[in-house]
Amino acid sequence: MGYSVEEIRKDFEQLKEGNIYLDTAATALKPNVVINAIKEYYIKFNGNSHSKMSIYGDKTSELIENTRNIIARYINSNKRNIIFTKSATESLNTCIFGIEDIVKEDDEILLTILEHHANIVPYQILSKEKNIKIKYVYLKEDYSFDYNDFEKKINYNTKIIGITMQSNVTGEEIDIEKICEIVKKRSKELNIEIPYLIIDASQGITHKKIDVRKLDTIYALVFSGHKIYGPQGVRNIIYII
């Protein structure tokens, strides 16, 4: 099925004059339907969510829960596992520092060199506070992800794994279903508990469908609402299994 670029342009005020926008990986432009929905909210509702003090609060609560249902269907999850935050950094910090008590001295965190700083700095803080080691998975000579290196670096001390679904620098896509299988296989071989696997899907979800029911070894998955044409106010979604 074909599509018309000109018809798509009509949905975005910034593109009607012929502009070309190449920074969607940072944040997507907002189509008119999103802008109109925000405008309608402030004109008609604008109440505190989950407040029974007014009909506006009820309507706002309904809108939020409907959105939660939509997101849950989008990634094939239970809506009770969906949490909204205001930024990618907050989402990852919530996941990482929420499990800081499970790590102890000499434990290890496994990251990749493809990670965004938001998925590195919290671990560096944790490493310094808890005296734990951070290991990195490197790339092959052709800059593709090295799954063999990833598998080898999971060991008896690995407690947390942080990994991007797609690099915001190189565009390299990591097969997160394959990652889950490797983690499961390696954990069984070593007879250890499955490490806490946190996936940053902020870039990847814009290019590939995610079914969290196929990712049965993950602890959490984070992605950005504003990169998939949602408003800036609700930036990130955390799926916690």
Which residues are covered by each model-predicted region?
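Pyridoxal 5′-phosphate
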Residues: M1-I241
